[in-house]
Amino acid sequence: MISLKSIVDKLYNLEDLSYQESYQLFDYFIKGQIELPLQTSILTALKLKKETSIEIAAAVEALFDNTKEFPKIKGDLAGIVGTGGDGFNTINISTTAAIVAATAGYKVAKHGGRSVSSKSGSFDLLESFGVNIELAPDQTKQCLELYNLGFLFVPFYSDGFRHIKEARTILKTRTIFNILGPLINPARPNKVVIGVYSKDLILPMAKTLVNLGIDRAVVVYGSGLDEVAIHDDTYVAEIQNNQIIEYKVSPVDFGIDTYAIKDLEGGLPEQNREIIKQILLGKGKEAHNAAVAVNVAMLMKLYDKDDLKQNTQEVLEIIKSGKCFNILQQVINYSNK
């Protein structure tokens, strides 16, 4: 076993960790074997050094090895998630996009937790809707099979995350756990859209996904947002056959107007719930509908639907039909049986 001291010394010298060292470090983290002051120092050192794709992949495996197993789903399974930490406090776009994608017929396992840095995390929102977020894995699997949608509350699958909650709250800044968050979906989807909070993270995240053996994925950075943007360009790294292709898209590529970031500003869970409810009922504002639609359109690309304009129009029609709220309501009812 590698000693914690030797790992910490390397980090203090801003040296990269080996796969084994990073695995051991995050095994210590998740088992609560690192004191709070040292946790904050380690997370700060990693951030200053900049995390490598090897360190991230090793950390993911360490976290998975300390997580409850989720039953395997037959066929394709999608995930759509952001790192958080972009600082804009937008409405919960990835959560809404997951519900809309499920309505469109794609199986989506949405994982996450309560808010650390924003006003309302994805599961703060879901709880405000009345979703029972602590559903047993076999029940969540059945929910996925019935309604194409399942919510996986990460702390329910690994109570070790409580050991790092205080350090993250104290630091009030983005840490490697923002990067790890999107990668630790217990359902292990094979098609994922991941939004990152920094352009510098696009390639490390994409390389990590290749290292983890993900089938198809896109990593996106939306000019300040950790999702596909409707206010400016979105930088993309797409993964297919272990290859990474980088490109850029703009609102015009999706056939939509350009909007301002402030058009997407969210609030407390109760305020967000009302905004999201209106979107799902087909009564949302144009900017809100567009933001959700472009993110689902990007997910559809992973299913060989390459025409982003056509994808976006299809999704907008589904949103405006009001059917999306029915799916959420069925999941709420199922989760509270």
From Swiss-Prot:
Catalysis performed (reactions): N-(5-phospho-beta-D-ribosyl)anthranilate + diphosphate = 5-phospho-alpha-D-ribose 1-diphosphate + anthranilate
The species this protein was found in: Francisella tularensis subsp. tularensis (strain WY96-3418)
NCBIfam families, sorted: trpD (TIGR01245)
Positions annotated to bind Mg(2+) 2: 226-227
Family of the protein in this entry: Belongs to the anthranilate phosphoribosyltransferase family.
Binding residue positions for Mg(2+) 1: 94, 227
EC number: 2.4.2.18
Record protein name field: Anthranilate phosphoribosyltransferase
Pfam families xref list: Glycos_trans_3N, Glycos_transf_3
Subunit note: Homodimer.
Database matches in InterPro entries: Anthranilate_Pribosyl_Tfrase, Glycosyl_Trfase_fam3, Glycosyl_Trfase_fam3_N_dom, Glycosyl_Trfase_fam3_N_dom_sf, Nuc_phospho_transferase
PANTHER family per record: ANTHRANILATE PHOSPHORIBOSYLTRANSFERASE
GO MF, one annotated term: anthranilate phosphoribosyltransferase activity
Cofactor(s) annotated in UniProt: Mg(2+)
Comment on bound cofactor: Binds 2 magnesium ions per monomer.
Taxonomy, superkingdom: Bacteria
GO cellular component: cytosol
Role summary: Catalyzes the transfer of the phosphoribosyl group of 5-phosphorylribose-1-pyrophosphate (PRPP) to anthranilate to yield N-(5'-phosphoribosyl)-anthranilate (PRA).
Pathway assigned in UniProt: Amino-acid biosynthesis; L-tryptophan biosynthesis; L-tryptophan from chorismate: step 2/5
Residues where 5-phospho-alpha-D-ribose 1-diphosphate binds: 82, 85-86, 90, 92-95, 110-118, 122
Keywords, comma-separated and alphabetical: Amino-acid biosynthesis, Aromatic amino acid biosynthesis, Glycosyltransferase, Magnesium, Metal-binding, Transferase, Tryptophan biosynthesis
Residues at which anthranilate 2 binds: 168
Binding positions for anthranilate 1 per the UniProt entry: 82
A single BP term in Gene Ontology: L-tryptophan biosynthetic process
